[in-house]
Amino acid sequence: MIFATGVGGFETLADQVTVYNERGARRVSPFLVPMMMANAGAAHVSMRNGWRGPSETVVTACAAGTHAVANAARLVATGRCDVVVGGGAEASMHPVAIAAFANMTAMSTSGISRPFDMRRDGFVISEGAAALVLEAWDHAVARGARIYAEIAGSGSTADAYHITAPAPDGEGAVACMEQALLDAGLSAADIAHINAHGTSTPLNDLAEARAINKVFGEPGPPVTSTKGVTGHGLGAAGAIEAVASVMAIDRRLIPPTYGCEQLDPEVHLDVVRAEARPWEPGPVLSNSFGFGGHNGCLVLLPPAD
């Protein structure tokens, strides 16, 4: 069980601070510590199901979900485990968290998520969870499981630049995408679709677009950001978008980037807009770039015949 979160039990912590201030130390819940710890998600799922293999939590901001899925896949690929559940969860829509993001000027003031649109003004915070059951091919076939996709490779790098802003040259993101391609044994020309991080912030979308162009040229493969629909699930986002990538393969449709109506003229990408685009499924790259310069990428393939 490898699970991700960005802020853990923030709501519990914030609520108990209010209890402390209003009612005193003796009224603070004894469950505060185990409920606020970031590892609680993986711990509770493993306890509920009696899973005694690896049970770990990844906390790398907005890249955490992608890193968790990648780490889970690695445990299977190396033969350490036959089956690993990888994913992420986030529930941080507390007034204090929202105020903090708003005061950072990271959140949208319009309340609309518009990835790559010229009118974008920040991300729209959301809550959610997603998980993938990852297992060795032979193990899945033996139990008659439906195989939706394969994880072929992953990348993980750091910008080493700023606690919140992406590196403007995009070199950390470029290195991460190239690392994922190398791990998958593919070239840039092999990628048929990119699920972008695409948060709808002015800085992130432009930095990611430039990084994609450096790796894939202009305009590159069809790009979508599902955050136009889901908002930004922070530590869960990468897992949610991995599932979206799998569904794009399964449904043979690239989802449109909701909210992107007027493409930013500085974004030189083939952004899928307005309606879903039918495609012949091929390798998909899913990007996640988080606060602190954490970068994560996954390469997913249609299942072999």
For every predicted segment, state its role.
Residues 38-42, 46-88, 124-145, 233-254, ...:
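Active-site-proximal alpha-helical scaffold in enzymes
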Residues 1, 45, 65, 72, ...:
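Conserved small-residue
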Residues 30-39, 56-64, 226-235, 261-262, ...:
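Active-site nucleophile and cofactor-binding loops and adjacent substrate-binding regions
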Residues 1-60, 89-97, 188-204:
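Conserved beta-ketoacyl condensing-enzyme motif
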Residues 184-190, 219, 268-305:
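Flexible, low-complexity linker/loop segments at domain and module junctions
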